[in-house]
Amino acid sequence: MFMDIPAIYSVYRGGKVKAAPVNIEGADISFVSDPMPLEYSADELDDRMPLLVADVRGLGKGGLDDRLLTNMKFPGSDVWFMTCIKDVEDVFDCFMGNIAKVLMPYHSVRNGIVMEEVYEVTENCIPVLFVSKGVVLHRNEGATGIGTALSELERIGFREIIVFDTDSTLRSDDWASLHEKSPDLIPFVRSKGATVDGIGFQKVIFDL
């Protein structure tokens, strides 16, 4: 079954869960306007469909925003929660909240051993490759090729891997090539558009 998965960028501020559009430059994520209280209705999504919630403060400061985790409530949705993950303990901390999947940014994880440990302890964690200017952000502020990063994760055993095109530089033929190599790959695009249409992906994430 094909899934369109909406993504929201959230923060816990002033005693409320709030959200707003963001600007992304490399690994830096910042709100482009003041976050507003989230007006959410379960009717907006199909029953039990995933909803991606990005922890903007956690991604920015390099650690989980536990106030967002404990206060966000999205009845009727399976929450996919993306925050800074450095080690296995961070993954366990995320599962203290009411979430279905932890999304693990490839560039925030300390090393490849942690990736292997995460794969061994849970099947509910999905790596996320942040792509900027056509390359994947890597640890220590470096970069690597998309194919290289995918191969590393697939050798560990991951099949569902999110490729987050943060600056919309990937073209339709890029996505088609990635799908041919990794059919279970999940594109994450900044807006719904033609770049991933008709290629055959089973899930696509897009900014709400």
What are these regions (language model features)?
Residues 146-196:
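Hydrophobic secondary-structure block in the mid-to-C-terminal portion of proteins
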Residues 4, 92-114, 162-168, 187-208:
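Glycine-rich phosphate-binding active-site loops on the catalytic face of alpha/beta enzymes
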Residues 41-46, 71-73, 93-95, 117-118, ...:
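Generic structural signal for hydrophobic
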Residues 72-82, 121-133, 176-190:
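Short beta-strand/loop segments at the ligand-binding rim of alpha/beta enzyme cores
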Residues 65-112:
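Glycine/small-residue-rich loop that forms an oxyanion/phosphate-binding "nest" at active or ligand-binding sites
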Residues 109-153, 193-208:
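Short histidine
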Residues 21-23, 98, 175-178:
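Surface-exposed, active-site-proximal loop segments in enzymatic domains
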Residues 1-77, 86-89, 124-127, 131-161, ...:
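Conserved N-terminal beta1-alpha1 strand-loop-helix module at the mouth
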